[in-house]
Amino acid sequence: MTSSSAPSRKALSKIACNRLQKELSEWQLNPPTGFRHKVTDNLQKWTIDVTGAPGTLYANETYQLQVEFPEHYPMEAPQVVFVSPAPSHPHIYSNGHICLDILYDSWSPAMTVNSVCISILSMLSSSPAKQRPADNDRYVKNCKNGRSPKETRWWFHDDKV
């Protein structure tokens, strides 16, 4: 993992605002199972509670996601991190950063907050063990000063969990 230049935080474009308002309306009518959006006045930053699926290692455990939308959403992926404490998972670092390809290189404008949440719940549900990534300490140490996970050049090598 290496770093690249940090994206700047700018106000949402008109397209991003329209898309997010539509997604929020759809979410409020039919939220994905296991998720609850905490309503605020900030369309650019969502807080979402995720509860582990029944029959999994994370059953009935609730964690919090923070989703920040870039100026050009949905052409650019949102930044999605777990707020402390992050679940122990082979693809979730203790600082909340998530190693999931759809949040980075495999992002598509056809994806939605709903589809991202379902992917994260699926990732949690398929885990055979609660453990941190092998390089957790090194990665977290290198992420000081609030570095965004979008500044990391991720290596997606394990799609089993």
UniProtKB/Swiss-Prot annotation:
InterPro entries: Ub_conjugating_enzyme, UBQ-conjugat_E2_core, UBQ-conjugating_AS, UBQ-conjugating_enzyme/RWD. SUPFAM superfamilies: UBC-like (SSF54495). One of its GO terms (biological process) is protein ubiquitination. Transmembrane segments: none annotated. It is an enzyme of class 2 (transferase). It catalyses: S-ubiquitinyl-[E1 ubiquitin-activating enzyme]-L-cysteine + [E2 ubiquitin-conjugating enzyme]-L-cysteine = [E1 ubiquitin-activating enzyme]-L-cysteine + S-ubiquitinyl-[E2 ubiquitin-conjugating enzyme]-L-cysteine. Gene3D superfamilies: Ubiquitin Conjugating Enzyme (3.10.110.10). Residues 15-161 form the UBC core domain. Coiled coil: none annotated. GO terms for molecular function: ATP binding; ubiquitin conjugating enzyme activity; ubiquitin-protein transferase activity. The active site is at 99 (glycyl thioester intermediate). Pathway: Protein modification; protein ubiquitination. Keywords: ATP-binding, Nucleotide-binding, Transferase, Ubl conjugation pathway. Its EC number is 2.3.2.23. Accepts the ubiquitin from the E1 complex and catalyzes its covalent attachment to other proteins. Belongs to the ubiquitin-conjugating enzyme family. This is Ubiquitin-conjugating enzyme 15. It comes from Arabidopsis thaliana. The lineage of its organism: Eukaryota, Viridiplantae, Streptophyta, Embryophyta, Tracheophyta.
